[in-house]
Amino acid sequence: SITDTVAKRIFYTALYHAFIQPAMFNDCNKEYRGTDKNVYGDPGFTNYTVFSLWDTYRAAHPLYTLVQPERVPDFINSMLAIYEQQGRLPVWHLYGSDTNEMIGIQSVPVIADAILKNMKGFNYERAYQAMKASMMSDYKGLSYVTKLEYIPADKEKESVAKGLEYA
């Protein structure tokens, strides 16, 4: 049997861990190094990194919209800045670089969730254009989806998993 004190300790420790990342990624004057390695001045929002989106888009990011909604526009504006710098929304952004390690582009459902929850502080049209361009790109089998409406297993590894992520 678990005591209330132990249960609370476990809960609040887990909640604390949920908020360790994403991390702020700018200097005290708000300058930051972009994905393209250029240094950018104050963008008008707090720039974030460590978007481990495949791990966080299902639960952590929806949680942020509920309990830390003031951070969400900065997350999304950071993702949109990454899009402007690398030509695609982030996959697994880590301290100024995208690792491209995961299948799918999970920043899309994160942004869509914020739009559906009517969150303010970012440009919906800009977000839509970034999502559309990213999902219409040739990233990891997406060109097959637009041409064939599926990803052939003999042409692309992890075709079923990618198909599920892109659905």
Give the role of each language-model region:
Residues 13-27, 49-72, 112-118:
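Alpha-helical support elements that line or immediately flank enzyme active sites
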Residues 47-51, 98-101:
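A short, ordered amphipathic alpha-helix with a cationic face
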Residues 43-45, 56, 60, 108, ...:
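Flexible glycine/proline-enriched surface loops and loop-helix/loop-strand junctions
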Residues 2, 46, 63-67, 95-97:
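Hydrophobic alpha-helical bundle architecture
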Residues 71, 78, 82-167:
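Active-site cavity-forming subdomains of large catalytic enzyme subunits
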Residues 1-47, 81, 88-91, 120-125, ...:
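Acidic/polar, glycine-enriched structural segments that form the non-catalytic walls/loops
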